[in-house]
């Protein structure tokens, strides 16, 4: 269901209820309740190995849940076919180098595949939506460039544009700022906020609590496969919670504009 085509009165795009995730002989997480609404950014936060990637694979329908329910537009995810899921939920992986030297335009056009079939040629509407997505991400001038020859930040914007061209109501981003320099991290986080302002639901994972303070409507903190805290970032990401989660003393300070930031209390060793 695209952002503008949602049934009236439908509040959640995606909701999990007491979700257990992992593998039959290797449980990873248990009892996780998430909810993503239109116009919100939900930040999935936690240290390495806490289960964020496995949870994302489960939400995307790539691996079966081990217990509980996943509801996508109020429908059980397990009852939806892959194409229906892809039309409703777009996935933005970490920036990567493509195996083949596709142009940026062709990379974005791949987002239209779920609407026309794998071997069908893109039509006029597909091309128009791809061009609109390129323009929205501010990378229209890169359309003819080789995707493998642009910067990491530009690749990430191209992947976000591909998700926009997919015309889904929910965008799932797996550590969208990983391996990016500071400037490109800021650029991507700004685009995340713009997507939410346009009415899309966004869920992203990160290791960095400052990203939650910068762009998230709500945060879900995972540790050891279980929910450690959930709610508004300013309310739940306290020094005590962060110190307990990351195992180092953390202070939360405020910038001149009032935005909280995390700082280590002691780097002296």
List each language-model region with its residue ranges:
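Conserved structural motif at the start of ABC-family nucleotide-binding domains
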Residues: 14, 28-31
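Conserved ABC transporter NBD signature motif
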Residues: 68-76, 85
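ABC ATPase nucleotide-binding domains
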Residues: 245-269
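The feature captures the beta-strand-to-loop junction immediately N-terminal to the Walker
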Residues: 45-47
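Conserved ABC ATPase signature
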Residues: 146-150, 154
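Catalytic Walker B motif of ABC-type/P-loop ATPase nucleotide-binding domains
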Residues: 171-175
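Helix-to-loop junction immediately C-terminal to a conserved catalytic motif
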Residues: 60
């Amino acid at each position: 269901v695209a952002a503008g085509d949602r049934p009236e009165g439908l509040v959640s795009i995606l909701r999990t209820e007491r979700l257990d995730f992992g593998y039959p002989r290797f449980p990873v997480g248990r009892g996780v309740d998430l909810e993503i609404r239109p116009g919100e950014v939900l930040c999935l936060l936690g240290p390495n190995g806490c289960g964020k990637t496995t949870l994302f694979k489960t939400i995307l329908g790539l691996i079966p849940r081990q217990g509980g329910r996943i509801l996508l537009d109020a429908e059980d995810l397990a009852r939806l076919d892959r194409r229906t899921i892809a039309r409703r939920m777009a996935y933005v992986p970490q920036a990567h180098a493509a195996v083949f030297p596709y142009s940026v335009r062709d990379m974005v056009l791949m987002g239209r595949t779920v609407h026309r079939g794998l071997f069908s040629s893109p039509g006029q509407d597909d091309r128009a939506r791809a061009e609109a997505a390129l323009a929205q991400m501010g990378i229209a001038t890169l359309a003819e460039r080789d995707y493998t020859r642009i910067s990491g930040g530009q690749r990430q914007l191209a992947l976000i544009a591909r998700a926009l061209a997919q015309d889904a109501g929910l965008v799932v981003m797996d550590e969208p700022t990983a391996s990016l320099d500071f400037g490109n991290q800021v650029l991507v986080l700004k685009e995340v906020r713009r997507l939410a302002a346009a009415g899309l639901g966004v869920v992203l994972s990160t290791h960095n609590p400052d990203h939650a303070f910068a762009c998230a409507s709500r945060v879900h903190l995972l540790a050891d496969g279980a929910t450690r805290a959930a709610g508004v970032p300013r309310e739940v990401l306290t020094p005590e919670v962060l110190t307990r989660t990351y195992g180092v003393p953390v202070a939360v300070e405020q910038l001149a504009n009032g935005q909280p930031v995390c700082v280590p209390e002691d780097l002296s060793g």
